[in-house]
A protein has these predicted regions:
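Domain-length cofactor-binding catalytic modules of enzymes
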Residues: 1-192
Length: 192
């Protein structure tokens, strides 16, 4: 598990580097000069040893991420007053949410919450159902720029291939597992 987690971390670092290099090429300034700093990084789909009232437990999060509340010693000091940031992705069309973990999440779900809205159909089904070119045009009409390596790959990410992000977020907010902080609307997407 540690090897897989390290590989995922390294992969995210490479992607971050490539994005910074792309911006530097386009804007003719270094990433540092533009203030392009990593704000937050977290793993999901991982197992970790964590301490709870029941003892030290291996918590496996599949389709989930950590959502520790304020005061948790598991958190870096910068987040101990607020609770853990939770980035909850929707689709390229609908946007995403920033949430924060709660004490209730620790009590009710071993400090876990979802990390995305979840799919309503498989990638293969989405490719059969949607056309990337049409999706790209629709998103352009909504003011969302999309760049994709392939149109079939883009079709996999159609908004209707995912659950309604607002409804999913509302359910965990009502349950007290996380609290809503901000809703983010897409203006641009890159699909590799």
């Amino acid at each position: 598990m540690n090897c897989a987690a390290n590989t995922a971390f390294a992969n995210r670092q490479v992607i971050t580097h490539q994005i910074r290099e792309g911006f530097a090429t386009v804007f003719g300034r270094s990433a540092e000069a533009m203030g392009m700093e990593l704000v937050y990084d977290v793993a999901h789909n991982i197992a970790k040893v964590e301490r709870y009232a029941e003892g030290d437990l291996v918590v496996h999060r599949k389709g989930a991420t950590r959502a520790f509340g304020p005061g948790s010693l598991e958190l870096p000091e910068i987040f101990r007053l607020t609770g853990q940031p939770v980035i909850c992705g929707g689709s390229m069309e609908t946007g995403s949410y920033l949430l924060v973990g709660t004490d209730r999440a620790v009590r009710d779900s071993f400090g876990s919450t979802m990390h995305g809205s979840g799919r309503t159909m498989s990638r293969a089904q989405a490719k059969r159902t949607f056309r990337g070119e049409q999706l790209q045009r629709q998103m352009k009409q909504q003011g969302i720029v999309v760049k994709a390596v392939s149109m079939s790959g883009l079709a996999e990410e159609a908004g209707l291939a995912y659950k309604n992000i607002s409804e999913v977020v509302e359910s965990v907010d009502r349950a007290g597992i996380t609290k809503k902080v901000a809703e983010m609307r897409p203006i641009g997407n890159i699909k590799g």
